[in-house]
Each structure stands twice: as C-alpha cells, then as structure tokens.
C-alpha cells in the first residue's frame, strides 16, 4: 500500500506494509483494562490465546509495567467484569460459558483481592465458604463513604414462582453480608 503525504514544498511517498487480516480477526488477549483510583496500577482481564479455558485478572504497576497480582479462573468460568472498589481492592464477577447459549451468564460468584494479590478470597456466591446459592448478582454501587463495602443486588432464580431481589451491603474484605432491603414483588429489578 502506498500512502502519499503532501506538504507545501514537496510530495513525499510513504510506504506501509499490509497488516494481515488475522490480526483483526483474532480474539483479543487483553479484553478490559481499568486504572486504579490513584492511577498507580492497571488491572486487565487476560485470555490465553493458546488455551481458551484459561482467563486471568492481572494487575500491573504503571511505573514499571511489572505484574503485581494474578487471579486465575479456569474451565468454563471467567471474570466477566471487574472494578476497583477502593484504592487497593479489586472485585471481579464470574460468568460461565455454556455451549448452547449465545452469551455467557453470571454465576453470582464474586472474588476480591488487593493490588498486590494479597487477601484474595471469594466474597459472594456459592464458592464463598458457607455462601448462598444465587444465580444472579450485580454491583449496584461502590460506596465512597464506606470504602470497605459495596452495594449489590442478588437473586436466586431457582425459586419456582420467581425470586425477590435483595439489596445487600457486602464487605469486600471478609464477605460479610447485611440485607438492606428486599423488593416488594417477585422478579423486580
């Protein structure tokens, strides 16, 4: 491909190599990148192009681009979304890929860790020690006045008549839950 750039004095010819189509069609290695509140760290979801059953949440120090923490998820599960809950802590939501569904679905499980990988633990869902069986959970809000907690909505879709959505105050360090309110009718959002 030949590109030309014109200036007021001369015309220059710039040559560029063709970019292979495979580069545009390939699955991305890094899918979602978010900067920490103090802009010290980057967190990103990483998908291994050689092993589609492996996904990671990776934290990098912006100053030297060294990896400071990794959270691994294997099999059909992966970290579908994550956010910086405060200056040091990241919360990730787990989703599952099932062959017969077009889109992955969230399992309701949440994992949290510090920027350095310390204090990594399941804080909500079936994987949490003594956790509840939920089929849906989503983050409603981070709480700037309470940096150790987030507000989530949770549902258990296994109930035949539908479920009551609960708003839960969730401690992002130990997974303690406190129900704030419950929807007055089933299947409310």
Name each model-derived stretch:
Residues 3-189:
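Beta-propeller folds
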């Amino acid at each position: 491909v030949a590109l030309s750039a014109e200036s007021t004095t001369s015309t220059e010819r710039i040559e560029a190599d063709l970019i292979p189509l495979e580069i545009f069609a390939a699955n991305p290695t890094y899918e979602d990148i978010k900067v920490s509140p103090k802009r010290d760290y980057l967190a990103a979801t990483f998908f291994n192009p050689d092993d589609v059953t492996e996904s990671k949440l990776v934290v990098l120090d912006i100053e030297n681009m060294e990896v400071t923490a990794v959270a691994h998820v294997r099999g059909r599960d992966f970290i579908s979304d994550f956010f910086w809950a405060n200056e040091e802590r990241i919360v990730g939501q787990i989703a599952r890929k099932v062959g017969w569904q077009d889109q992955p679905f969230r399992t309701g499980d949440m994992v949290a860790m510090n920027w350095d990988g310390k204090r990594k633990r399941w804080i909500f869902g079936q994987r949490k020690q003594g956790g509840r069986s939920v089929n849906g959970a989503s983050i409603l809000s981070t709480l700037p006045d309470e940096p150790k907690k987030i507000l989530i909505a949770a549902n258990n879709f296994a109930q035949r008549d539908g479920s009551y959505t609960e708003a839960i105050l969730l401690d992002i360090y130990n997974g303690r839950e406190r129900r704030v309110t419950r929807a007055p009718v089933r299947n409310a959002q």
